[in-house]
Amino acid sequence: ICSSDVILFYFLFYDPETQPDRQRQQADRVDLVDAAIDGKLERIDAHWDPRPSVGVVMASAPYPETPVTGDVIYGLDTVPADAKVFHAGTALDAHGQVIATGGRVLCACALGDSVADAQQRAYAGVAAIHWTHEFHRSDIGWRAIALERAAG
């Protein structure tokens, strides 16, 4: 970037927008960041899994207002193996139980042979997890699935 303007690059690996892609990225993320810092990114094989990935955020109600915190989260150990759960708003309580600490708490992600398949697998991960004030959207991926179906 050759300019007198200052640009802020704000990128967080824990943002829900990045988590489905984190499943697809096969290269070591530390190596990628180090290479980017050193200006040698072209030397890294940033292999991507070509399959689609879908991520469903699980939040604490009444997100985005002040969410309820402290609910014990159940079912993390029963999530299907083909789904991955990213933690964002969790902690361990005094008894070692995973609790919701507010806002966007978890993101259940999955890869699939199609967007519809990835969506089904991600929602299977969501279905395994529960806590008292949990909520999630049930329409994640619908636009991409409609495009996929229209394409044949």
Walk through the language-model features, giving the residues of each:
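Short, small-residue-biased leader/transition segments that mark boundaries at the very start
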Residues: 1-6
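Structural beta-strand/beta-sheet cores of well-ordered domains, especially the beta-sheet scaffolds
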Residues: 7, 18-20, 52-54, 83, ...
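Active-site "cap" helix and flanking loop/linker of ATP-utilizing ligase/carboxylase catalytic domains
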Residues: 12-82, 93
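Short C-terminal domain-edge/linker segments immediately following a structured domain
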Residues: 37-39, 85-91, 116, 138-141
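Generic beta-strand/beta-sheet core signal
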Residues: 57-59, 88, 111
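RNase H-like, Mg2+-dependent phosphodiesterase core
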Residues: 71-89, 108, 116, 122
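Generic C-terminus detector
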Residues: 94, 100-152
